[in-house]
Amino acid sequence: MSSITAVVPVRKGSQRVPNKNTKSFAGSSLLEIKIESLKSLGDLLDDIVVSSDCADMLAIAKDLGVKTHVRDSYFASSEVNNSQFFRNLAESISGDNLMYSPVTCPLISKETYSKCIDSFRRIGKPVATVREIKHHMWQSGKPLNYSIENSPNSQDLPDIVYLTYGVCLISREDMIRNSNVVTLESTFIKLNELESIDIDTPLDFEVAEYLYKSKNT
């Protein structure tokens, strides 16, 4: 059976939430919580690798017994776009298949991880988590998903999802070939509102911490 390596990317710089990866979060940190969550999956994973340009974060990973990858500072900077970052990450980490696992999604359950891995094993196609949205959306002065002359109730809007990036499971070869963690063949696993939370702002951090504490008390 081909191997699955969970990859946890973290970097020094955080433009909106300073030191968010190691900042105190529910008595721990986002990095530590993610590592422990992945370790709890046991034999479902073959390896866990933390990729970072930060010595302190790499030290945390080593203390928790997982592998590390020293990321080039250029690929940890805002100078590279997502595609460049994804391709470099896949080229730098060994393993048949990679499970992209950012620390900014701390509320993903063990059941969801298992569901994603099971789907990947059974169907053999990339897997990515998504969140369904039902909003009247506009771009460049025009509605995107409805007609202004016949505005539907929100529940009747077309099914549109956005990538949460909470779990993205893909073969290493596909990740390099597509320079991405998703492809046109990806199977989408829908998350609920709680699990789809992604920390990008100070408010996100506070809300996620409150919900994490509520869920784990």
Residue ranges and their predicted role:
Residues S3-S51:
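N-terminal glycine-rich phosphate-binding loop and ensuing alpha1 helix
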Residues R11, S73, R131-E132:
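Histidine-centered beta-alpha loop that forms part of the nucleotide-sugar donor binding/catalytic region
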Residues A55, E173-D174, L203:
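Alpha-helix/helix-capping structural signal
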Residues A55-M99, L107-K115:
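Short phosphate-binding loop-to-helix
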Residues N82-F85, P106-E195:
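Conserved core of the sugar-phosphate nucleotidyltransferase
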Residues E195-T217:
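Hydrophobic helical membrane-anchoring modules
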